[in-house]
């Protein structure tokens, strides 16, 4: 069901909304686009009730009643039958798990979803892949700690005394220049993360490699770090030198280790097999890649950056 419209002429409307949940306690729920697309011409109570339902992770059926005087548009594309465990990014591929265990796909850590979105080429108007950003469970507390340090707080974050610390963090992360610095500090702290790329159309390793390389080179500081990047990008080329294809709905896992290295794993769904592709040991490649994924002036996937920002806001 997409874009269901209830007109003003309806005297009383009853909506059945099922399996609405939160993303690990985040202020924005897993089905965040659902909450964002509610329009009721001033019926703020309706929107607030939905928000609270998502916040507290209630998954049982629930009914809302809207009296005459407003219209509502509801988009439930992100509502899944098991929404507490997955989030739908695009209907053409499998939903993203909210959690990964290190026992799965030979991953190095247990991970929780930090943000998600679609990577799309705007001028060609087509989607390329779904992007999920995960953080190691043991490092979640480190995010709050980092954004609360006295130096960052006084210099970059808590500059508006009329706002709370979380509100100032969110505003700073939405500032292109501050975001670049704050995310850079986060990545320099040794935080362990993972990016999950799931193509929405058949592709190959050459295209994925070229895309990742371009993403790294588009980092605002890439020009001044060209010499340092050469070795790391050569490693990246070698790691993704496989001439094979990557089918739609396959997964490419990119783990960012505490030392800044990147570990690449291909999940071949047809063969039900996880294949280790290699490691890029130069930390500048990992830092620039994940910086482009979750922050900076020109994020690779704006929806992903937005959901990551919302999650950090809920953590701090």
Swiss-Prot record:
GO cellular component terms given for this protein: mitochondrial inner membrane
Keywords associated with the record: Mitochondrion, Transit peptide
Transit peptide feature range: 1-41
A molecular-function term among this protein's GO annotations: heme binding
Transit peptide recorded as keyword: yes
Protein family membership: Belongs to the AIM18/AIM46 family.
Name this protein carries in UniProt: Altered inheritance of mitochondria protein 18, mitochondrial
Gene source species: Vanderwaltozyma polyspora (strain ATCC 22028 / DSM 70294 / BCRC 21397 / CBS 2163 / NBRC 10782 / NRRL Y-8283 / UCD 57-17) (Kluyveromyces polysporus)
Native organism taxonomy: Eukaryota, Fungi, Dikarya, Ascomycota, Saccharomycotina
